[in-house]
Amino acid sequence: MTPYNRTSQVEIMAPVGSYESLAAAIKAGANSVYFGIEHLNMRARSAANFTTDDLHKIVAICREAGVKTYLTVNTVIYPEDIEMMQTIVNHAKQAGVDAIIASDIAVMQYAVQQDVEVHLSTQLNIANTEALKFYAQFADVVVLARELNLTQVASIYKDIQEQDIRGRHGEPIRIEMFCHGALCMAVRGKCYLSLHNLNSSANRGACAQICRRAYVVKDKSSDIELEVDNEYIMSPKDLKTIHFLDQMLDAGVRVLKIEGRARGPEYVSTVVRCYREAVEMWEESRKSKVESRKTEMEQKIAEWDKQLATVFNRGFWNGYYLGQRLGEWTNDYGSKATKKKVYAGKCTNYFKNIGVAEFLLEAIPELHEGDDLLVTGHTTGAYECTAREMRTDKPVTVVKQGELFAIQTTEPLHRGDKLYLLESIG
């Protein structure tokens, strides 16, 4: 389905919250996808989740593409959740899901009983080798604690090799780390701010994101408000590691996890593609240690940085991987993406023999030749192109609202796909 090497030793794991994002992840070169169903996952409220009825279809789509499927069941599990948890794990087994991502021992034990592979969530806060050795009896992959630096990660990786720490299925346990996306003010998501203020528990997948709002510091006795340098004092910037990805991989990280199940397919497509290219360059550089490749990598990093800035982000920082102990906070609400998408219309037909898509412009006044476009759909994923050689009943440079028009595309599109205009910001 794609030209990407899915047999790479480094796994790119993409977030999926919709069929559009699923298609985007596959086409961009993801090795695996992770997603939630029902309410026992850490994005139960903020992301569009699938249902148990979707499992067989998701697994079938991914198997055809050679992509692994991981189901998140990583919230705190209360007594009244046990039956639902068991039902979800049973459905996952029947559908052929490759692994369950878990943080509660009840989920791990039941998954093991059902012979379903387990991956350890970062919610477990595993930060040392001894803890990892204990949990290895249940799992094959571990997401280490987010606040670890790469020296500490490398030390744990060395212990895995030297002490021959193996997972439940007998293979050396693999280290997974987040490489890109949103970070929590509570570092690993163990936050009670939303629960305390709105009775909506982040640890149950219902974070209300009130840390992302602007706040003032007020003296209760005098009502004096203090001005602070940054009113978004609890909203961290997003993680980006592509400029030191080689250090992560050299430290022993073998699964790169992208955050963003609540994001659109264009986010998934762009981020997966950039990190896939970076991993392939790292693998090539290990084979041929040529100095020119260092310059080439530096040039590519600048390109990737520019591309990653076009999709949702709150500004970027390195996380804690390089030894920084204090977080970096955003100074704005919402996204700092350099492009925004504006709904423009829909695909009304696709002519496979000539590679031409027909669209109805229904939501913006005009579309001009040279405009950047985004098309999304359940099968299409996220396809970007530029409006060139547009035709109505004749060649045109401007299309008016309500008109049908056609353009050549390099990928097949589908009737019902959504058309967006991509506008530059700033």
Give short role names for the model-derived ranges.
Residues N90, Q109-Q114, L132-F134:
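Hydrophobic, small-residue-rich alpha-helical packing segments that form membrane-like cores
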Residues M1-A28, S32-A44, H56-V59, A65-T75, ...:
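Surface-exposed amphipathic alpha-helical tracts and adjacent flexible/coil segments at the periphery
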Residues S21, A106-V107:
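Alpha-helix capping/helix-boundary segments
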Residues A48-D54, E83-I88:
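Charged helix-capping and loop-helix junction motifs
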